[in-house]
Amino acid sequence: MEKWYVAAKKADFDKWAKEFHISPVTARILRNRDLTEESQIRKFLYGKLEDCYSPWLLKDMDRAVEEILKAVKEGLHIRVIGDYDVDGICSSYILTKGFQMLGAQVDTAIPHRIHDGYGLNEHLIEEAKREGVGMIVTCDNGIAAAPQIELANSLGMRVVVTDHHEVPYIEENGERKEQLPPALAVVDPKRSDCSYPFQGICGGVVALKVIQAITEKTGNPGLINIQDELLEFAALSTVCDVMELKDENRILVKEGLKRIQKGYNEGLKALMEVNEIAPDRLSAYHLGFVLGPCLNATGRLDTAKRALELLQSFTRADAMTAARELKDLNESRKNLTVQGIQRADTYIQEHHMTEDKVMVIYLPEVHESIAGIIAGKVREKYHHPVFILTKGEDGVKGSGRSIEAYHMYDAMTQVKQFFTKYGGHKLAAGLSMREEDIEPLRTALNEKCTLMEDDFIPRVHIDVAMPMGYADDALAGELALLEPFGTGNPKPLFAQKDLIFQAGFKMGANKTCAKFRVKTPEGNTQTLVFFGDLERLGAFLNEKYGIGSEEALYAGRGSFPLSVVYQVGQNTYKGRTEVQYIMQNYC
């Protein structure tokens, strides 16, 4: 079960409420998002694109712009090399489109997940040389590709790196010494010598900053005209790469959603249409859980070039055809994922892995492209750091997903002798290794792991404990000011004790969600909606109140007190909008 915590951060909530014309409840939520200054609150609630940081604050941006413009002027063949996930695809689109506006001779190469693996490799470098490429510009990769960039240099090609991943390092006398690749410019906010105010931007935003800097430098009208469209892809990258929706990320996603709604890009418009997303209902949720997975599916089960082709579609007909194919591909990916999760559960039980602090699960028959998704689902269920390893064409490949208390990239660096290649950040990573090293890796990771039992218990952070009736139409509407929600800015959570569950009604085509009639301690009757695991809820009721309790509840004969964590939303049906209370947790 989880541990519930009610936030108790202090501030003058009445003053904030008066200053920003919000309720004290909303003011308290803002404080729970670690905002302390009025300037921070103003930026959070009403931030505009002008509040984002100058691209020139990124280390090496001046050199990157100079080298790219020089290559364009000299007529060099420029190749953008990205990655096969959404961030890599969108980053590639941003840079390629921007360079095209400059009149550059430019094309794009996206590594094949299985044949090439992540990022730059010798094959891509040698292929670029054969095809007359004079400059390589990386996006969403490159920071850990020193040997490959050395090869490119030796072959007479120029390289500019744009990335956002952790910089590789070695330990010398107890100090970290960064190992930057030998490129003409290395633009990465995670460089220790980079003074950019916010490190948490994705590859797509770094790419956008490069194009913004070139636009400022040149005043190119074509670049000025595509800024709105490029912002769409920076927003999509940010959400799909699970960046925290704080600081300028929040502004970029908020403004990017507005641009996507206007439909600047035929490919995104088509993808929304085939997924039946109304533009006026678009949210960060749709980016991360509907549109993003369709783009990601190409890199998982086919080639990510298909996603890039969708985004580069010129006609609606071409875009619709490509969008339908991507949607079908994503359905196939979902089916494979369900099977993979079942296999992971079986492996955990058979290998008594619940005793391990770090779970290293080898599923040779699972498609390597869905290892990360499976790792995320297993992490959610067991709340342990998880590595899912699969058998690739050349050794073992895998993905890791972590919990907040465990810095995965640092932990991997401590045992890097087991990897032929690895990279990532605090909460996610990718790797390649030899099959014979799997068990030694599992042993080493667990021996070095300092996590305590308390770290494995999920925490539920409640913003405000208050009666459901306090969350009226006005508050529900006001909470929309806090959108977009996502990593780093979760939907606000409220809690109330001793709600009496009186009746329940299952809903949906497969009866997988439910509505409950509850009576509050104040004597009011309210309706709670639940989209969680109904089977688990039923088992909980039967255990707590006796066999038959679940049946009694759905028969309208319930009288079961529960404490509940809930969210407040708005539901519109047949033109009528009303407050909706959504149960998240119970005990």
Walk through the language-model features, giving the residues of each:
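Hydrophobic helix-and-loop "lid/oligomerization" segment in the mid-to-C-terminal part
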Residues: 7-134, 155, 173-176, 182, ...
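A short acidic, amphipathic alpha-helical/loop segment
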Residues: 147-151, 359, 374, 478
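Residue-level marker for buried hydrophobic side chains located in beta-strands
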Residues: 80, 137, 160-161, 238, ...
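Active-site cavity-forming subdomains of large catalytic enzyme subunits
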Residues: 126-204, 208-220, 225, 229
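Mid-to-C-terminal polyanion-binding domains and interfaces
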Residues: 70-77, 318-324, 328-362, 414-587
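Non-catalytic interface/linker regions that flank or bridge core catalytic/transmembrane domains
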Residues: 3-5
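A residue-level signal for conserved active-site and pocket-lining positions in enzyme catalytic cores
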Residues: 30, 137, 296, 479, ...
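Histidine-centered active-site/metal-ligand motif
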Residues: 164-165, 367, 425, 513
